[in-house]
Amino acid sequence: MIGDAMSEPTFATLVSRWYERSARDLPWRKPGIGAWAILVSEVMLQQTPVVRVVPAWEAWLARWPEPRALAEDTPAEAIRMWGRLGYPRRAVRLRECAVAIVERHGGVVPDRLDHLLALPGVGTYTARAVAAFAYGQRHPVVDTNVRRVVSRAIAGEPDAGPTTRPADLVATEELLPIEPAAAALASAAFMELGAVVCTARAPRCAICPVESSCAWRASGQAAPTGPTRRPQRYAGTDRQVRGLLLAVLRESTGPVPHRRLDQVWHDDVQRARALAGLVTDGLVEPVGEESFRLAGDGPPSPSPLPHLPHPPHHQR
């Protein structure tokens, strides 16, 4: 897979040197940042732009600088602190992860890959990222950006194509230096290259550290053929309604009456569906039959099910 003009140490070395000169100055990359801070950053960066994550990450770590601090707080406070980062289920899972770290590992983020994978909400990518970036281990860390870099520079293809996790991991691992610390640096460098230079639609090939040996450039740089990503519609969706409901609940210091939530959105059926989804996802819980609150924001409620409005007769 790797041609004579681009052996694995040459590729990794070139990209790593570029990274050390040109990488973005992000707070979770600073020397001395611990595994918990890196884990939090990786969870927040899933589906959320860096510019929005930085202030949220700093505020989160200021409040909960270690897993035990978060584990001792409530799910409701985690949801409040998550604010408008989006996909707030991540906040609940991050707290569950903190609880597991305290119970299973004495409050220290584990360094073994299998132990990381066993934590709630931690998947293959996040586990490998923490093992590499926090503990300097040799693991291929593969996201969309890395897949695109490998596809273009090594295979000469403009698009990475469908995800094939085992093959992607193997292809990326072949590029890593043998020495663990150098491999961890290369993993971060590959990711950064795909994020800021080898981008999906407007690659900056002129400043790429491997431009001269890139298989895609050598083959004539065929245009990407994959589907163009369209921005997901937000206005009028259940996601918007969920966000509006959560905003009211986050700002409340106690249970919120159902009638107050009824004012959030005009469509009774959609509002009821969104509220039921928040309950199912463990973000919101009923208090009695006519009020709701953020999960864990008070003593257990005797009522296990929310009281949801019936749809209008013409919509049944």
Language-model features: where?
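Surface loops and adjacent helix of pleckstrin homology
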Residues: 219, 289, 297
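Short beta-strand-to-coil "C-cap" segments at the C-terminal boundary of structured domains/repeats
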Residues: 98, 294-299
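Short amphipathic alpha-helical interaction segments
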Residues: 265-280
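Structure-specific DNA junction-binding interface
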Residues: 2-9, 13-18
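Catalytic cores of DNA base-excision repair glycosylases
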Residues: 14, 18-242, 248-259, 264-269
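Short, amphipathic alpha-helical interaction segments positioned at domain boundaries
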Residues: 298-316
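A short, conserved structural fragment
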Residues: 279-292
